């Protein structure tokens, strides 16, 4: 495997310098719409597709109420986006500089909602980190408990 940033990987894929590309949305949706790329396999049943919001441990310890409010607001936006996908696609296309057809495809398969990290989620991520280390994709073994939220 060759590890490239999304823009470099797309260029390599587009030129035929790589035969396949592992990527996530909205880059996947863009490749599908603009390059005619097709999905050979996805991670359904292997790993969960999650996104994360981070803060420093110090900030989280000093301002838990701010983080609670942030999660509430993110969930409010997610609820709106889930019910208004066309409007959300238009908004997102302006922010990302992508055609609305791309953001519409991306949002059509997106999962909405934010929740605190749990021990189960951390265990999923630890298994992925361990596999990456075993495959020599990362240089050292990680202990994700070091990144666990305060109080977990």
PLM region spans:
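Short beta-strand-to-loop elements that line the ligand-binding cleft
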Residues: 1-5
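C-terminal solvent-exposed extensions
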Residues: 134-152
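Residue-level signal for threonine
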Residues: 56, 118, 148-152
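Residue-level "edge-of-site" marker
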Residues: 26, 45, 106, 145-146
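Residue-level detector of family-conserved "landmark" positions at structurally sensitive sites
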Residues: 42, 103, 142-143
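Pocket-lining segment of extracytoplasmic ligand-binding domains
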Residues: 6-94
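Secondary-structure end/capping motifs
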Residues: 61-139
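Short secondary-structure boundary/hinge segments and terminal tails
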Residues: 31, 48-50, 110-111, 148-151
